[in-house]
Amino acid sequence: MADTLPTHAQAVIIGGGIHGCSVAYHLAKAGWSDVVLLERKQLTSGTTWHAAGLVGQLQGSHATTAFASYGVELLQEIEAETGQNPGFRQNGSISIAVNDQRLAELRRKADFASLFDVEASFMETAEIAKRWPLMN
């Protein structure tokens, strides 16, 4: 990190949140060496710090699902590459249908998951009650 700002740069990124850091990272990976990232406080100390950081990998389209899956892969690669733990944990999730329309959507998502190697399964009410008896 430089103590003074350079007079020129190939790219100047304003904001050291998740998006700004990602742009700087990807430019550097692409071979750019003249990149400046400006942040008024500490990296990821603003909105990024306050975010829950949830990454739902199954989205409504191929493009957004691929983007979310890439984000998960990237977090794993960054830890392997740098030795720094980004604090990312894969916990999974449960989605519950309260009507027939939502049930159809969840069935579609469970089928859709296999296209992206995202582990997903569809459970009927009886199986859920057996696995998690306290769930009402």
Predicted regions and their residues:
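Short coil/turn connectors at secondary-structure junctions
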Residues: H8-A9, W32-S33, N91, V118
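Beta1/beta-strand and adjacent pyrophosphate-binding region of the FAD-binding site
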Residues: D3-H19, V36
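Short, flexible hinge/linker loops that cap or flank conserved catalytic cores
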Residues: D3-P6, K29, F88
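Glycine-rich FAD pyrophosphate-binding loop
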Residues: A28-W49
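Hydrophobic alpha-helical packing residues
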Residues: L27-A28, A113
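Fold-independent oxyanion-binding glycine-rich loops
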Residues: G17, R40-K41, N99
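Dinucleotide-binding Rossmann-like beta1-alpha1 core, especially the glycine-rich loop
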Residues: G53-L134
